[in-house]
């Protein structure tokens, strides 16, 4: 992929020192997925994928059960998936994914976060073309060669397999998430350190110390917003 790997879980743990924020975001996403179809991951592919991702963040069962029960019962909240694109200092690019029951509030909050922290919002498509939607898996205990050979034996295509530190990273097409994960399990993988959808930048940029400080404030401001689920960017943070 030509890009340094940033461990999603470690990044989230650093940014979200209060894990309740992560749990709240997954609770909302699980509710929406369960409400969109059957509240059973065996028959609801969207719900299954969210639950697989939630495992890698150690989301407690009571959070998951509460969200699914809410979808089964009287939960009548409707949420929209929104994507915002924008720019930070020195050509940095950001994609902000949100899940909201109040579009006007979210748009205003995201715009304010950009404006107050050295950035500005762009129009739809102004940034996304520089990123690739990717299913990403992180595994310990197996080499890239072993994983690639095992996947080839199962006739499973992936974009790339690399090693970064203690992790072997598998990049795949997003619509192949479940297929690739099942294939990896067939190779003996029992635990995924990462199982996530990402928007990966095609190229990274580096910022000056001052610009990076501004950029990190922008990221923090966006991730602090209640409706924001994910923030992706093209900066190689030092």
Swiss-Prot record:
The lineage of its organism: Bacteria, Bacillati, Bacillota, Bacilli, Bacillales. GO terms for biological process: regulation of DNA-templated transcription. PANTHER family: TRANSLATIONAL ACTIVATOR OF CYTOCHROME C OXIDASE 1. GO terms for cellular component: cytosol. Belongs to the TACO1 family. YeeN subfamily. InterPro entries: Integrase-like_N, TACO1_YebC-like_2nd/3rd_dom, TACO1_YebC_N, Transcrip_reg_TACO1-like, Transcrip_reg_TACO1-like_dom3, Transcrip_reg_TACO1_YeeN, YebC-like. GO terms for molecular function: DNA binding. Keywords: Cytoplasm, DNA-binding, Transcription, Transcription regulation. Gene3D superfamilies: 1.10.10.200, 3.30.70.980. It is found in: Cytoplasm. This is Probable transcriptional regulatory protein SH2225.
């Amino acid at each position: 992929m030509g890009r340094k790997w940033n461990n999603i879980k470690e990044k989230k743990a650093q940014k979200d020192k209060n894990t309740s924020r992560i749990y709240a975001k997954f609770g909302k996403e699980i509710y929406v997925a369960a409400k969109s179809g059957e509240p059973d991951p065996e028959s609801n592919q969207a719900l299954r994928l969210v639950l697989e991702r939630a495992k890698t963040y150690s989301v407690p069962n009571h959070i998951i059960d509460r969200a699914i029960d809410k979808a089964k019962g009287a939960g009548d909240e409707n949420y929209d998936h929104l994507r915002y694109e924008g720019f930070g200092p020195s050509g940095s690019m950001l994609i902000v994914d949100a899940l909201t029951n109040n579009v006007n509030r979210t748009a205003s909050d995201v715009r304010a976060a950009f404006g107050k922290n050295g950035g500005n919002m762009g129009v739809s498509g102004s940034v996304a073309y520089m990123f690739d939607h990717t299913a990403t898996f992180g595994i310990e205990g197996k080499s890239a060669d072993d994983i690639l050979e095992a996947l080839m034996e199962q006739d499973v295509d992936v974009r790339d397999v690399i090693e970064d530190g203690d992790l072997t990273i598998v990049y795949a097409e997003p619509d192949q998430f479940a297929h690739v994960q099942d294939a990896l399990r067939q190779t003996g993988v029992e635990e995924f350190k990462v199982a996530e959808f990402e928007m990966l930048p095609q190229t990274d940029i580096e910022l000056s110390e001052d610009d990076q400080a501004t950029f990190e404030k922008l990221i923090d401001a966006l991730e602090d917003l209640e409706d924001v689920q994910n923030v992706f960017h093209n900066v190689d943070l030092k």
